[in-house]
């Protein structure tokens, strides 16, 4: 592995020089485009613009709340793609991002449990471009505590996620799962460590809520309902939680 280099990159996240000014807070959702579009329409959201990539274009909406405007955008799956869009959100005005999406359970967690992330085990590659090498990245405590307090106030069951961020969806082996559980991980995802590392590098505030979908707790795979009910609730919970960031 090459040493971490904190020098500026030669390509800036705002290289396109878009006429786009985002609200300070953003909800970054690992959910389908159709679900996000429907939610934005139901909330009276306003289209702000789009971020283009080689494979697709990502619409950005502005939702009005009693605590001010919040941007809403679909997050692409996988650490490199997710951070590519996170960087652009920061470049065009976002100061605080709340990511929300599903995860796999490694321990005996029920399906559709919503878990604010406390820390992530770094077994992807993207975070190492943004922080010195190390096994873990701790998430910002202040926004997590505000989100947890809000969840408790609303009666939403709340416990921490200690997540294993992996690039290898089909390489979650029995021995790796055992090792990650011994280290304290209770869920697995594909982006959290990288998103937190990017936010810290850019000096921005970041939090993430994961909801449980499938499970590997028995050292075999049970897809359960793939977090279907969690997906239905995620945008409402995410928007409300973003208001307290």
Tell where the protein language model's regions lie, with residue ranges.
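Short acidic/polar active-site loop segments enriched in Thr and Asp
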Residues: 95-96, 186, 205
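Flexible, glycine/charged-enriched surface loops at secondary-structure junctions
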Residues: 47-52, 156-161, 245
